[in-house]
Amino acid sequence: IVYDKKTAKSAGSFIWDNEVGGMFIVTATAFKNTNADSLLEDITRIVDSFGKEPVTDKELEKVKNSVENDYINNMQTIMGKADALASFWTFHKNTGLINTMVDEYLSITKEDILKAAKKYLTRDNRVVITYLPKNGKEN
């Protein structure tokens, strides 16, 4: 939607994990001439594809490299280590995961991702929020 269709000037996603539950959040900023409903259709098509076909080997390798790099960089500071220990205690009651969690992430397979996407990334399991300019006009 950013590089090929050019319906959004920016797009991204992230996971917001919480103690009781979490969210997978997708954001996109439309170009002035892009209709919000059209952009939502494009995003929906992309998210729906996660549950239909496995990610490619290249995509999985890219994500694993990013996870490992982020984890190593985060462990370079006392604050990063403290935050990781606090998170592991809050979510798992196990600070020892600081030594093994990155390996668990790196062991995830394409099939694991496909199974999770089919379970959690369904149309019935989402909330859509659209922010429009102050004047209320999409274009």
Predicted regions mapped to residue ranges:
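M16 family metallopeptidases and their MPP-like homologs
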Residues: 1-52, 57-106, 124-133
